Amino acid sequence: MSKGTTSQDAPFGTLLGYAPGGVAIYSSDYSSLDPQEYEDDAVFRSYIDDEYMGHKWQCVEFARRFLFLNYGVVFTDVGMAWEIFSLRFLREVVNDNILPLQAFPNGSPRAPVAGALLIWDKGGEFKDTGHVAIITQLHGNKVRIAEQNVIHSPLPQGQQWTRELEMVVENGCYTLKDTFDDTTILGWMIQTEDTEYSLPQPEIAGELLKISGARLENKGQFDGKWLDEKDPLQNAYVQANGQVINQDPYHYYTITESAEQELIKATNELHLMYLHATDKVLKDDNLLALFDIPKILWPRLRLSWQRRRHHMITGRMDFCMDERGLKVYEYNADSASCHTEAGLILERWAEQGYKGNGFNPAEGLINELAGAWKHSRARPFVHIMQDKDIEENYHAQFMEQALHQAGFETRILRGLDELGWDAAGQLIDGEGRLVNCVWKTWAWETAFDQIREVSDREFAAVPIRTGHPQNEVRLIDVLLRPEVLVFEPLWTVIPGNKAILPILWSLFPHHRYLLDTDFTVNDELVKTGYAVKPIAGRCGSNIDLVSHHEEVLDKTSGKFAEQKNIYQQLWCLPKVDGKYIQVCTFTVGGNYGGTCLRGDESLVIKKESDIEPLIVVKK
């Protein structure tokens, strides 16, 4: 970012000129911002249709927008511009194909090319953030680049570049020199399968991924009513759990900033990998059959994917993280939970007891959710559907708060008793309001069970009621009505079903974040040991952990015993201060939104497992 401002600087958001392809370059002079116009963080989000470009009008936003408009590809979201240099793929936006991206160091025998990304390390002019630009032209011994957040004054008419950098060619190697004397150019990135002279993807040192235990000094901070029961949301949590977060509120866990950065990178990358696999599944009947979804729903699934693939609000990935690395267990893409605990209750815990310089890595979760809702295409009134489980009360209220922050009207429906039909067969709530947009806590699989109770041959289509003698509305009568916009969309059952895990492994074999998974116990799984998991199981139910000696290490019961199983490479959770610890990250709008921890004295995390306080320790 440019230091200071000059009299020639244009106000924030002013069009400064154009890069090749007619891609606009905007002023990012934040000192000129009108606080009233930009009082909400969501206003800074830049979108083209449903595709998130970045934060207005930073360098990353421009680079992603340039690639999107000119080549139809984007790179995954990053926290800082310098982190782009560690990415190794681009996503093709029309079909979610993943394309290889290679990084070449400054001074490489591989020449830079027009259209390549140029990446700076953090430091100097680009302190903390680093920088990214687009190489637009090689002009003799100069390279012309286009960028945002360096200059803030209009370009000369017709000029489609912001700066010229000197290029030195010596002994067959290409070195670019910046116009600033205190910066470091890492290199350039080219979309190609050719890996000659490219850098391998950097790997984080194992010790930086270690989860550590810590303690607060016990001054009685949590002896009384430390949660505010006058706040309806906190009160709903207290009604379900009391003034309690875990067995010992003075104990907490810490991770490094490097570990959080790795979680951000992994979450964003895995989300795109899951989307890529979902696209493959929905194009292949043989793959889709592996998910045991009623065949009568297949056309609706494909329509949902075609029309609403960018409408997912939030999900949760479950990881194992320790010195061995980072491995994903599964993606709860359909009906994830733990948002309230991570984004509110543990934030109150930190305010009440933690005095260090670290932070709760889910502190901004509700703001992220509000931002996602603002760009969701949801209708102005959203019905929030939950079952009558007391824990669902605060989960529903947390999402309601995010919706209100985003400007939506809402009504929470506890169970289905309030719903009915008007004279025309339209679905209405107890106040006579039409139900046409819902966010649900129910899993889609619950609705599928209602369909399985009816033979496909009895009906020409999904058996949705538009009336009933006892006014009995079922879940499928709401979620599968064509005019009802449901969040999360129907297609999210595919990434949320564990049948996708063997498909992911086949598409990305030996990927550093994946575990070998199959529909049978193959030879490799016999060697490593394996976890047996029902494909649509939830809450850690019906899981067996089997060692390479065929010894059962842990076993849980539940209601999913009749389901098809997958077999996943055994990768046990680390035991830290007496508990097995699982890392969970939230996706919001397809990008990382925060982290929390679950802890249990057994190897399998279950519904009743604790949420553990987590602090990211700053250097």
Swiss-Prot record:
Please give the annotated consequence of changing R538A.
6-fold decrease in GSH affinity, 2.4-fold decrease in spermidine activity, and 4-fold decrease in synthetase activity
Molecular function terms, GO-annotated = ATP binding; glutathionylspermidine amidase activity; glutathionylspermidine synthase activity; metal ion binding
On the tree of life, the source organism's domain of life is Bacteria
Q: Which signals induce this protein?
A: Expression level is unaffected by H(2)O(2); however Gsp rapidly accumulates in E.coli in the presence of H(2)O(2).
Q: Which residues form the Peptidase C51 domain?
A: 34-176
| Site (Transition state stabilizer) residue list | R316
EC annotation from Swiss-Prot or TrEMBL: 3.5.1.78, 6.3.1.8
Cross-referenced InterPro entries, in alphabetical order? Answer: CHAP_dom, Gsp_Synthetase/Amidase, GSPS_pre-ATP-grasp-like_dom, Papain-like_cys_pep_sf, PreATP-grasp_dom_sf
Concerning its family, UniProt says: In the C-terminal section; belongs to the glutathionylspermidine synthase preATP-grasp family.
GO biological process entries = glutathione metabolic process; spermidine metabolic process
GO CC entries: cytosol
Q: What is the effect of changing R316E?
A: Loss of synthetase activity
Query: What happens on changing E391A?
Result: 2-fold decrease in GSH affinity, 60-fold decrease in spermidine activity, and 10-fold decrease in synthetase activity
| Modification(s) after translation | Oxidation of Cys-59 to sulfenic acid during oxidative stress selectively inhibits the amidase activity which leads to a rapid increase in the amounts of intracellular Gsp and Gsp S-thiolated proteins (GspSSPs).
Annotated positions binding glutathione: R316, S335, E392, T446
For region Linker, the annotated ranges are 196-205
| Record text on activity regulation | When exposed to oxidative stress, Gsp amidase activity is transiently inhibited in vivo by oxidation of the catalytic Cys-59 thiol to sulfenic acid; this modification does not affect Gsp synthetase activity. Gsp amidase activity is negatively autoregulated by the Gsp synthetase domain, and is activated by the Gsp synthetase substrates, GSH and ATP-Mg(2+); the occupancy of the synthetase active site may initiate communication through the protein as manifest by the release of inhibition of the amidase activity.
Q: Report what the protein is called.
A: Bifunctional glutathionylspermidine synthetase/amidase
Reaction catalyzed: spermidine + glutathione + ATP = glutathionylspermidine + ADP + phosphate + H(+); glutathionylspermidine + H2O = spermidine + glutathione
Q: Which residues bind ATP?
A: 316-318, 498, 533, 539-540, 568-571, 582, 603-605
Q: Where's the active site on this chain?
A: C59 (s-(gamma-glutamyl-cysteinyl-glycyl)-cysteine intermediate)
Q: Which organism is it from?
A: Escherichia coli (strain K12)
Q: Where is this region: Gsp synthetase?
A: 206-619
Q: How does activity depend on pH?
A: Optimum pH is around 6.8 for Gsp synthetase activity.
Consequence of changing T441A: 3-fold decrease in GSH affinity, 21-fold decrease in spermidine activity, and 17-fold decrease in synthetase activity
